[in-house]
Amino acid sequence: MKGDRSRQNMAVTKKAKLKKNDEPKKVLKTAATEKGEGSKRYSLWNFWISTLFLKLLLIPDYFSTDFDVHRNWLAITNKLPISEWYYEHTSQWTLDYPPFFAYFEWFLSQFVPKSVRDDGCLDIVEIGKFGLPTIVFQRLTVIFSEILLFVILQIYINTTKLSERSQSFVVASSIVLSPGFLIIDHIHFQYNGFLFAILIGSIVAAKNKRYILCAVLYTTAICFKHIFLYLAPCYFVFLLRAYVLNVNNFKFKSYKDFLFLIRWANLLKLATVVVGIFTICFLPFAHQMPQVLSRLFPFSRGLTHAYWAPNFWALYSFMDKILTTVMLKLPYVHTFATKFIKPPLIPQNIKEINERLAANNNGSKGLVQDVFFVILPQIPPKLTFILTIFYQVLAVLPLLFDPSFKRFVGSLTLCGLASFLFGWHVHEKAIMLVIIPFTFLVGFDRRLLVPFMLVASAGYVSLYPLLYKGQDFFIKTLYTYVWCIIYFAAFRKTTKISSSVERRIFFLDRLALTYIFSLLPIVTVLQILDEVKWRYSFLQKFEFLGLMIYSVYCSLGIISSWFALSWLYNFDELLWQ
């Protein structure tokens, strides 16, 4: 017995010695890994130089009416006094962005060379008449303003821990090479790279717990592009909980103790910078605020855009089309429906259905005006606002209890999704408001990868109708699918796998992959039909059908991503620890 005990003690001692000897090796291994990570140069400037050639080649390519929009804004801010900027309406492309963007346009107009001025760049006319000099100048302003995006994301990489730097490099490079920025900015024509750089700066500041800087950059972003207001509930709750409220040290004994719940100095600093930035932005227009607000929030434009954004209202509009067709072809379906749903919630008879079709814009004419549904109830702006706020409240509640960066980015993504899916007159380009914050989130856990793949692939493909000319089909399709292949694989390699949870959260991931792979044949068939439709009169009757397929199919992917992320965000506590 004594011999057995002594042998056991010797074995335990030997194990302890081996463990003790292994500890320095582990430390050295960790140090070596970090040294290896630190010795690598995670620079984005190689990407800027390499993509510069592609962007320069795209200068003479197709551009949308947004090009003349921004040309007109250059002219307005350059030629007119500031008091007339938001009143000028010679062109239909009136100034409808916040004042900081107007100041930005004024700044750019100061660098317009004489040859570009002579080309008509700064003429205030109903329809712009310009040539290659104006095109080159405006394209270059987009390219060089986008440098800010590279700078902000390089700061994000450099401020990340060495052990996580490869992951942050994947995140940053996927954003600067985003198909969305290539399609929207460098072909279609806008300044989203520059504008999202400011928003991303606020996200990076939040990650580094620089809360005042976060507030400054987010408020500035709103003053450049008011669509960022959709994210305000998330920023408000995050800054309130992380910077203003002193919850950790709070002990309730009497109601006076609530005074100590608030860090008053922090609240004062936060309020000062936010109010100060809004004052700088809007003070020159204080006497014309109703006019400015009417330009920024034009509710008369209708529920959906001419091309339905791939959201809930696209499915709602599609269902209205299906019901209308079915009831006209099979009148007894209408008779059956009226037994359960009474007018005015449904047309009284087939004659009324035909009258509504003849009289109203039912969403399939490509008109930018108020849309009237034939069968389904009309949707007022108030309802879209209520739905958006409801789902945003659900997104920010967990953030109120856990103001971590991971929760913040998750809440930010869901707030963007809620506004995109249920908002009023949402543009397809607003999907970038979802994809960009989701990119920062996906690296935390591999279970987030499939929802991200869904929203990224469906979101980027939904932008294809912006470039409707056949000459752009190859570039937009090839670039998007190469990006998807590279970065979906890169995220799979660099994202963490939670060892605490082995079950498959997103159990429909194979169905999701089937959906993603189906996008390519769908867009190819639609492009072929678009190219040959002029030969066949029956295809010309269904001119809007291709856009409808884009909207409906892409909305299915984006809504599925929303369901999956919402489930993980609200019910998988281990993922957020």
Swiss-Prot record:
UniProt region (Disordered), positions on chain: 1-24
First-listed, main subcellular location of the protein, grouped into a coarse class: endoplasmic reticulum
Listed pathway(s): Protein modification; protein glycosylation
Enzyme Commission code(s) on record: 2.4.1.265
UniProt membrane topology term: Multi-pass membrane protein
Transmembrane segments: 43-63, 93-113, 140-160, 169-189, 220-240, 267-287, 308-328, 383-403, 420-440, 448-468, 471-491, 505-525, 544-564
Localisation: Endoplasmic reticulum membrane
GO CC annotations on file: endoplasmic reticulum; endoplasmic reticulum membrane
Main EC class the enzyme belongs to: transferase
Stretches assigned to the Cytoplasmic side: 64-92, 161-168, 241-266, 329-382, 441-447, 492-504, 565-577
Highest taxon above the source species: Eukaryota
UniProt GO MF annotations: dolichyl pyrophosphate Glc1Man9GlcNAc2 alpha-1,3-glucosyltransferase activity
Gene Ontology biological process terms from the UniProt entry: dolichol-linked oligosaccharide biosynthetic process; protein N-linked glycosylation
Side of membrane Lumenal, spans: 1-42, 114-139, 190-219, 288-307, 404-419, 469-470, 526-543
Catalytic activity: an alpha-D-Glc-(1->3)-alpha-D-Man-(1->2)-alpha-D-Man-(1->2)-alpha-D-Man-(1->3)-[alpha-D-Man-(1->2)-alpha-D-Man-(1->3)-[alpha-D-Man-(1->2)-alpha-D-Man-(1->6)]-alpha-D-Man-(1->6)]-beta-D-Man-(1->4)-beta-D-GlcNAc-(1->4)-alpha-D-GlcNAc-diphospho-di-trans,poly-cis-dolichol + a di-trans,poly-cis-dolichyl beta-D-glucosyl phosphate = an alpha-D-Glc-(1->3)-alpha-D-Glc-(1->3)-alpha-D-Man-(1->2)-alpha-D-Man-(1->2)-alpha-D-Man-(1->3)-[alpha-D-Man-(1->2)-alpha-D-Man-(1->3)-[alpha-D-Man-(1->2)-alpha-D-Man-(1->6)]-alpha-D-Man-(1->6)]-beta-D-Man-(1->4)-beta-D-GlcNAc-(1->4)-alpha-D-GlcNAc-diphospho-di-trans,poly-cis-dolichol + a di-trans,poly-cis-dolichyl phosphate + H(+)
Signal sequence region: none
Keywords on record: Endoplasmic reticulum, Glycosyltransferase, Membrane, Transferase, Transmembrane, Transmembrane helix
Family in the record: Belongs to the ALG6/ALG8 glucosyltransferase family.
Primary role: Dolichyl pyrophosphate Glc1Man9GlcNAc2 alpha-1,3-glucosyltransferase that operates in the biosynthetic pathway of dolichol-linked oligosaccharides, the glycan precursors employed in protein asparagine (N)-glycosylation. The assembly of dolichol-linked oligosaccharides begins on the cytosolic side of the endoplasmic reticulum membrane and finishes in its lumen. The sequential addition of sugars to dolichol pyrophosphate produces dolichol-linked oligosaccharides containing fourteen sugars, including two GlcNAcs, nine mannoses and three glucoses.
Name of the protein this chain belongs to: Dolichyl pyrophosphate Glc1Man9GlcNAc2 alpha-1,3-glucosyltransferase
Species in which this protein is naturally found: Saccharomyces cerevisiae (strain ATCC 204508 / S288c)
Gene that encodes the chain: ALG8
